[in-house]
């Protein structure tokens, strides 16, 4: 980032990578916060901030950022993250709905597969159809 101090994507990528590994979360927060200052409307940076907040145990903030990100761009990866936050809050039906949406857009999504496996969940099917 020394070579490109104005590159919000570099800050975001490093911050997200740290959060994904659940390491150095205060540093991850600072990096993503810097990216968000540079590009406040970027849904992928909002997703990263939501994920950092989730890893830090701030479920209200995590849900807020992830809902905003998903409203801007209904990306499968954002849906997976928001679904995991809802699951952690006990909203299994809400999580399942988002995971179904993610699966509909990208059936081979690795983040969805690994999240479902880690949480011992499977996609619920609508038996009425």
Stretches found by the model and what they are:
Residues 71, 92-110, 117:
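TPR/TPR-like (Sel1-like) alpha-helical repeat modules
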Residues 7, 16-17, 42, 51, 75-76, 84, 109, 118:
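Residue-level recognition of tetratricopeptide repeat
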Residues 3-4, 37-38, 71-72, 105:
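Structural marker of alpha-solenoid helical repeat scaffolds
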Residues 21-34, 56-68, 90-101, 128:
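Structural signature of tandem alpha-helical TPR/SEL1-like repeats
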